[in-house]
């Protein structure tokens, strides 16, 4: 996966959706940060579902500050690879990772998607606000918000 890839996630009875917020490569190390949206649904999500979803984030100066994260090493993410399907790619507005949450299972992703808004003092924005442009196999679109 590459930064900006939009991924549908297959849980047992429903789907979620996330994007790769960063890929960190170093000597003998490859790690992925996945930013999860609040979307859970029965059908496989589309890029339009992703754009219509909400994400935990705020503003930090002129950048968006993501408040959702699942931080996987290459080995752990590789064991779940059959649960992910790339459905598109996004170019994002400037952002920083405001949270780093180690993850190794599908439950870790599900827990990020369903974090309690009040307990964790989360604010949500329309995912579309963070997107400069997106592409699928069928089309490339610059977001006019």
Can you describe what each PLM-predicted range is?
Residues 7-9, 20, 34:
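Hydrophobic beta-strand residues in large extracellular and virion-surface proteins
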